[in-house]
Structures are given as structure tokens and as C-alpha cells.
Swiss-Prot record:
Belongs to the glutamate 5-kinase family. GO terms for biological process: L-proline biosynthetic process. Pfam families: AA_kinase. This is Glutamate 5-kinase. Its main location: cytoplasm. ATP binds at K17, S180, D181, T222, G223, G224, M225, L226, S227, K228. Substrate binds at S57, D144, N160.
Length: 275
């Protein structure tokens, strides 16, 4: 079977997910260059008539920077306080930098219960549609200050990989672009095996792929590759498509949309029916 060519000409609505590791430098300082490039790319896409929703982590990282804390607190209430401070700082910076490119942004903070209850789901769907129709970029994050992860009342999404897949589903996005600190999905862990090969296209998520995504405890673990595979499964359930790519250079998003084979493209093959 020949390689399927990536056709993104018809893609109008795009969800882009960026993680903390892309926004915060190893020193704990904010990666201003990255945020500026991302704002430029999204604004360029908006100017071309695309609709873009940004799912952004980073509240904790921004909060630690502002409060001059060396490491993430272990206490949940403190974590929530740090995230609460960081969320405002992050949105303030996004707002300023997007303004350079004449793009307006808004904030949507979600918890899982919002998308579980039909009434609140309808409301948040309408909010997205309304913002998009006004030419505004919704910036989405989990509402860390109120999210809880307890058995009887779980309102956390788990992480923003899953949140981005949920948002792509809610908004019926044509494409989810997940920016990561790795180049895509490999056939085995590239940090261990030098001969690991990047998978260019994944049409079916097999048990083998889930296994090769690695266990917890590595950057391929929780919030790592496994959650990205689970997100791809959600995208498939919603009949969508996803590209997992390295976020080192946000301008690569423009190259991906031109059909260049960067990262891993998750797209089911349409069933061809014969009479």
C-alpha cells in the first residue's frame, strides 16, 4: 500500500496544543521567543481565514517563575494557588504578544464535568462558536484551581493532551496539532534505541503501538507518549485527525499545513466500498 499523502487544503478549524516544556525554559524562565513565534504563526493562519483554538499548559510553570519558587509544591492547595497566579500571568503575556499581531485572545478554563453535563457542554460549545465567529483565538486550559481528582467527583481531564482532544471534539475541529518535545511517534523508545524509526502515518492504533508508547516513569509515561496515543484514539472516535510534532520551531506548523511530512499524522483510512 502506497503512502497516503497529507491533504490539509480543506482544513479550516485547527486546535493547537502546547505544553509546559515548550513554554518554560529548563531554567524555569518563560520562553518568550517560543510564545512570540506561536502567536505569529496563529495570527498568520487567522489572516488566511483559518480558525484556531490554542490549548495551553503552563500555569504552574508561570506561577513558579513569578513566585520565585524553585520547585513545584507537593501540597495540593499550594499547587492550586501557584497555578492560579500563573494562569493570569500566562494569559497576560499571551494577550500582549498576540496584540503585536493584531489578534485578540480569550480565556476558557474547563473542568471535565463541564463537558459531561449536556447543558454546560452546549453552553461552552456556543461560547467557542461565538468567539471564533468574532475572529478571536480562544486559549483553553484546565481550571487547576478548582479541578479535583477524587473517585467520587473526578473533574480533571488527566492532562492537556486529553483536554486538547476533547476540545477538538467539542468544536468539530478539522485537525488537532499537538506540539511536543519529541519529533512524533517512534516504533520504539528513541531515548533507548538508536535505530528507532519515526512513524509518518498511523491509521490504526494497535496494541503494539500502545505498548511501544512505554510505561510510566519516563517522559514517554504519564503525560508522555501514552496520553498522546489516548488522545489520538479520542480524535479517531470523533472522526478527526491529528499531527504529533516537535514544537521546537512553531513555524513548522505552517510547513505541516502545506503537507510536508513532519511529525506523525494520525488519520484513519476511509473505507472504500465496492458495489
Amino acid at each position: 500500500m502506497g503512502m497516503m499523502k497529507r491533504q490539509f487544503e480543506d482544513v479550516t478549524r485547527i486546535v493547537i496544543k502546547i505544553g509546559t516544556s515548550s513554554l518554560v525554559l529548563p531554567t524555569g524562565k518563560i520562553n518568550l521567543e517560543k510564545i512570540d513565534q506561536l502567536a505569529f504563526v496563529i495570527s498568520s493562519l487567522m489572516n488566511k481565514g483559518k480558525e484556531v483554538i490554542l490549548v495551553s499548559s503552563g500555569a504552574m510553570g508561570f506561577g513558579l517563575d513569578i513566585l520565585k519558587m524553585e520547585k513545584r509544591p507537593t501540597n495540593l492547595a499550594k499547587q492550586q494557588a501557584v497555578s492560579s497566579v500563573g494562569q493570569v500571568a500566562m494569559m497576560s503575556l499571551y494577550s500582549q504578544i498576540f496584540a503585536h499581531y493584531q489578534t485578540n485572545v480569550s480565556q476558557i478554563l474547563l473542568t471535565r464535568d463541564v463537558v459531561v453535563f449536556p447543558e454546560s457542554l452546549a453552553n461552552v460549545t456556543n461560547a467557542f462558536e461565538s468567539l471564533i465567529s468574532l475572529g478571536i483565538v480562544p486559549i483553553v486550559n484546565e481550571n487547576d484551581a478548582v479541578s479535583v481528582d477524587e473517585m467520587d467527583h473526578a473533574t480533571k481531564f488527566g492532562d492537556n493532551d486529553r483536554l486538547s482532544a476533547v476540545v477538538a471534539g467539542i468544536t468539530k475541529a478539522d485537525l488537532l496539532i499537538m506540539l511536543s518535545d519529541i519529533d512524533g511517534l517512534f516504533d520504539k523508545n528513541p531515548t533507548i534505541y538508536e535505530d528507532a524509526q519515526l512513524r509518518s502515518h498511523v491509521a490504526v492504533i494497535t496494541q503494539e503501538i500502545i505498548a511501544s508508547a512505554g510505561g510510566a516513569g519516563s517522559k514517554f509515561g504519564t503525560g508522555g507518549m501514552l496520553s498522546k496515543i489516548q488522545s489520538a484514539q479520542m480524535v479517531f472516535e470523533n472522526k478527526g485527525q491529528m499531527v504529533l510534532m516537535n514544537g521546537a520551531n512553531p513555524r513548522d506548523i505552517l510547513r505541516v499545513l502545506e503537507g510536508q511530512p513532519l511529525g506523525t499524522w494520525f488519520k484513519q483510512i476511509e473505507e472504500v466500498t465496492h458495489d
